[in-house]
Regions:
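DE-rich acidic low-complexity regions and acidic surface loops
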Residues: 1-168
Length: 168
């Protein structure tokens, strides 16, 4: 079975004996050298490989390391849960919307994230620790009666995406 665990800056291939490396799409020699050096310092065990993704070009090394650490912990948890479980059972959910937000949009440049649902906000805070080197943003629970999208003026632009009429 071919397993791949995607992170923001890397993809972990736990049952793959290839060496992995830096994405072929990264053509700048300085970027390739920096990322290759970082990749080689991960000391992957035999039978495991890692590919550094193109969006790692602009990332800080500590963020790439945090991404890799998260993927290693995730793989360890998946293996342990698999050994303890009786099939069929869901072992891990990797692409839920909240996981995608925490993994893909957890950037240093984002100043604030607003949640209308308290349960989702708490889950995000837990996930943020896995995906981020430092929590650098304001996380707010929106409590007003006016719906969140209306309050921020984004309801109409979103609704227009589903309109059947195209105005030229």
């Amino acid at each position: 079975t071919f397993i791949s665990l995607p992170g923001r800056y890397s993809v972990l291939l736990p049952n793959n004996s290839s060496t992995g490396g830096v994405s072929k799409k990264i053509s700048n020699p300085l970027d390739r050298k920096r990322l290759k050096k970082l990749h080689d310092n991960f000391n992957l065990p035999d039978g495991m490989s890692l590919i550094i993704r193109t969006n790692a070009i602009s990332a800080e090394d500590e963020d790439i390391i945090a991404d890799f650490s998260y993927l290693r912990k995730l793989w360890t948890k998946i293996r342990e849960d698999t050994l303890k479980s009786k099939a069929p059972i869901l072992i891990a959910e990797l692409d839920t919307p909240i996981i995608k937000v925490a993994r893909d949009f957890n950037q240093r440049t984002i100043e604030e994230i607003v949640f209308s649902d308290l349960k989702t906000m708490k889950l995000y805070k837990k996930l943020e620790k896995d995906f981020s080197v430092k929590a650098n943003k304001k996380i707010t629970h929106y409590k007003d009666k006016l719906p969140l999208f209306e309050s921020y003026g984004i309801k109409n632009p979103i609704n227009s995406l589903t309109e059947e009429n195209i105005y030229l």
